[in-house]
Amino acid sequence: MASLIYRQLLTNSYSVELSDEINTIGSEKTQNVTINPGPFAQTNYAPVVLESWEVNDSTTIEPVLDGPYQPTSFKPPSDYWILLNPTDQQVVLEGTNKTDIWIALLLVEPNVTNQSRQYTLFGETKQITVENNTNKWKFFEMFRKNVSAEFQHKRTLTSDTKLAGFLKHYNSVWTFHGETPHATTDYSSTSNLSEVETVIHVEFYIIPRSQESKCVEYINTGLPPMQNTRNIVPVALSSRSVTYQRAQVNEDIIISKTSLWKEMQCNRDIIIRFKFNNSIVKLGGLGYKWSEISFKAANYQYNYLRDGEQVTAHTTCSVNGVNNFSYNGGSLPTDFSVSRYEVIKENSYVYVDYWDDSQAFRNMVYVRSLAANLNSVKCSGGNYNFQLPVGAWPVMSGGAVSLHFAGVTLSTQFTDFVSLNSLRFRFSLTVEEPPFSILRTRVSGLYGLPAFNPNSGHEYYEIAGRFSLISLVPSNDDYQTPIMNSVTVRQDLERQLGDLREEFNSLSQEIAMTQLIDLALLPLDMFSMFSGIKSTIDAAKSMATKVMKKFKRSGLATSISELTGSLSNAASSISRSSSIRSNISSISVWTDVSEQIAGSSDSVSNISTQMSAISRRLRLREITTQTEGMNFDDISAAVLKTKIDRSTHISPDTLPDIMTESSKKFIPKRAYRVLKDDEVMEADVDGKFFAYKVDTFEEVPFDVDKFVDLVTDSPVISAIIDFKTLKNLNDNYGITRSQALDLIRSDPRVLRDFINQNNPIIKNRIEQLILQCRL
């Protein structure tokens, strides 16, 4: 039955309105555009998969260790350490503002007895007593407050690295003192810091004060090995060419301007608030099993003050590179299990797309020099109770990660009404204490943040920082860049599909199994699938064409086309015969596929992997084989038909996507069997395989080669009632050989009889198949 629908999708054509084609082109067309790099280049959206070689373009990063530079005289900028690297010079540095501060640094070699030496300081000859009875070098800091006073010995730095430092900050001059590796900083105050000039007699480096910890590290432990090679040649300070412009936190600076365009630099502080979202899906049955617990994208809107201006911001938080965990407490229906739950760890990334209504986000299309600096934040997991029908509840608790800023690019953020050009901030992760565990299970001591309760009661997580960018905008501020309408239309459709998927998944428990079996036996075709939609015949024809076009681009349709070749007579009604028959046109191609599988069996050592690969190909054989029983696609189509009839969100726009998606995702865990005399061989897509006798259900050794030969020559049967269910049914109720053969062949009459008798084992199996019909 379902194969008839799929054949119609592959072969039939229907009339369609031209307006439908135009809408499709407008919403789905993509084109390759080559941008000529010049003064202005359009930035790309952020990548979905991150690679180790990824770098941020047009981002200027201030070096931690800038140099070395040749000896010179200059007025050093404030908030930059001058790291002095002498060789054997006696006078290292002289600095003064000629009003209230004169500082000189003298270098004394190891093992020097008390003696008087002559130095030339600020053009004057001075006799200064020095002594160094250690094996390290000593820096003597000489100081005076007025031009007529004598120099006094103020501080000493004893160093085995032979490095010293000098800094102008706030209203003081800072230097190092003490003994390495525990040297610290100290200061001398002045009323005129800006006029302090220096004469540096040695090679030196420049380090920003924001990296002061690095400067302290170099003073105490030495320069990196690379800086100590003979290939490092000092250059003149003029090569640095630094413009010391102290930008405000929030300001717009016009970089350049022509008659039509101008470059605008935007500097903004920023407060990012975000939260995680998750999806918790529970399996059917007795209520002891969960299907999946995963992260979902989460939107958050909020207001905050920026320099007295009220800003409305919108963020979208998503994750990449999740780790899949699972827990299985046993095979019984009352054993607690979670098939899959997601955890983010060190190999994961968190994306936060940020947009606000300020001027900075207008016309954000052509952007360069995009940079940001953000704080880190710790995200901790809370508790989640697995509410079991009976017994003590397992409790998931703990887990934490820290988010560290790792880059920023442009992105597009979709809201309910418009798509917005926004900034995507990327965060790398480190795991933190405490680890997570599941109480009353053996899961404990694992690190990362699981998707169970990632917000832990917090309304949001908050990160503060700032960003800057240079944007090409029209000279006339009244112009704005339009948003592509087709992008918004397509996003609206995606949102409708999301609502429809949630509704479809929630309808699974409302389907009566007896009606499902009856519906699965009906000769459904394309038009009968549309009965739940109130529309005209013309609309139905147009909709059928849309479904057909979607399906032809799917992976399943491509596989079927390759397998079956021409199916020109597929639109005609195919009646079921009393015996199993195969589509002749598929035999030769399937034989080729089987030979490929058999040929690969020697190279693949894992039998389970072989069975999984073979079972996934068996679905193609299932679609091209008609039997007197049911197959998985009969159930899939019946469930789809029932949900379409009950749905309130279905429409001609969403049905094509839903039908195509259901053909791929409904009942992903399929099992197939072949029957030879009194022996049944069964395999599923997870790689599990069985061989057993029909009379006793006693397992026998599984012969892979025999199985490959059988699937080439014999019909493939959908294992609606799998081996585990058959054995359970026989052990608890006892079944005859005739009943066993009927269940093995998935005879719908026998299935209906068992369901009408309210047999719990058969009912539970059919319920599980219905619950697997998820999008």
From Swiss-Prot:
Feature type site, description Cleavage: R230, N231, R240, S241, R246, A247
Protein's name according to its UniProt entry: Outer capsid protein VP4
Region Spike head, annotated ranges: 65-223
Span list, region Hydrophobic: 388-408
Region (Spike foot), start-end ranges: 509-775
SUPFAM superfamilies xref list: Concanavalin A-like lectins/glucanases, VP4 membrane interaction domain
Note, other: This strain probably does not use sialic acid to attach to the host cell.
Stored Pfam families: Rota_VP4_MID, VP4_haemagglut, VP4_helical
Ranges in a coiled coil: 483-515
GO biological process, one term: virion attachment to host cell
Disulfide-bond pairs as recorded: C317-C379
Motif mapping: KID motif: 643-645
Record family assignment: Belongs to the rotavirus VP4 family.
Motif DGE motif positions after renumbering to this chain: 307-309
GO cellular component term, pick one: host cell rough endoplasmic reticulum
Positions of region (Spike body and stalk (antigen domain)): 247-478
UniProt keyword terms in alphabetical order: Capsid protein, Coiled coil, Disulfide bond, Hemagglutinin, Host cell membrane, Host cytoplasm, Host cytoskeleton, Host endoplasmic reticulum, Host membrane, Host-virus interaction, Membrane, Outer capsid protein, Viral attachment to host cell, Viral penetration into host cytoplasm, Viral penetration via permeabilization of host membrane, Virion, Virus entry into host cell
Keyword Disulfide bond: yes
Motif YGL motif, chain ranges: 447-449
Xref: InterPro entries: ConA-like_dom_sf, Rota_A_VP4, Rota_VP4_MID, Rota_VP4_MID_sf, VP4_concanavalin-like, VP4_helical
